[in-house]
Design a protein with these regions (language model features):
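ATP-binding N-terminal substructure of ATP-dependent carboxylate-amine bond-forming enzymes
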Residues: 1-76
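Short, hinge-like loop/turn segments at secondary-structure boundaries
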Residues: 16-21, 94-98, 122, 140-143
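Conserved residues at the C-terminal ends of beta-strands
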Residues: 52, 106, 185
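Phosphate-binding site of ATP-dependent enzymes
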Residues: 110, 117-121, 128-186
Length: 186
């Protein structure tokens, strides 16, 4: 059964979603087929619910994790909603700061300018964005505070630019606290 977070709701004290039954296939180009028209299903009737929700990390995102937290223990939610909610991707990386370039989180333009003076080549990222949206690279010759002002209503992440990013970044996979591997994103 496949649904989008926007299709998740509570009705008559039951967690429900409107979505589609689908069938998985071993075909690289067409790996699933919808097996139903859009229907409403009670998520507690499923043994597992797999949570994979892309940011932006906003109130819709948070609300869906709160709703999934209400499922009975008989329905296992893979990617615990509480853990997902409490582990925002960009801030979670500070648990591994020894692997990070110099990094700043702020909404203060003066502090960003000081960081740029020191690091000389920086990347700015909305803290709760995704998919590369709102990411900007600046050096001392092209810094434009007007671009950043659009994002400074919330703190942003600012990092020293590292050339190795051209080789891609890595997504690390853990299951129940155990490392299972990583995937290069290029």
């Amino acid at each position: 059964f496949y649904y989008n977070p926007k299709d998740l709701f509570i009705k008559e004290n039951t967690i429900q979603a409107s979505g589609y039954y689908l069938e998985l296939q071993l075909d690289e180009k067409n790996y699933f087929n919808f097996k139903s028209n859009k229907i409403i299903a009670k998520l507690e009737d499923f043994q597992f619910v797999f949570l994979r929700q892309d940011p932006p990390f906003d109130m819709n995102y948070i609300t869906s994790t709160y709703i999934l937290d209400l499922l009975p223990s008989s329905t296992i939610v893979v990617n615990d909603p509480t853990a997902v909610r409490n582990s925002t991707e960009k801030l979670f990386t500070f648990n591994f700061k020894e692997f990070m370039p110099p990094t700043l989180v702020t909404k203060d333009l003066n502090i960003i300018e000081e960081f740029l003076d020191k690091e000389e080549d920086i990347v700015t990222k909305p803290l709760y964005g995704n998919g590369g949206e709102g990411i900007h690279r600046f050096d001392k010759s092209n810094f434009n505070s007007k671009i950043l002002e659009e994002y400074l209503h919330l703190p942003i992440m600012v990092q020293k630019f590292i050339n190795e990013i051209n080789d891609g970044d890595r997504r690390v996979v853990f299951f129940d606290g155990e490392y299972y591997g990583s995937v290069a994103r290029i």
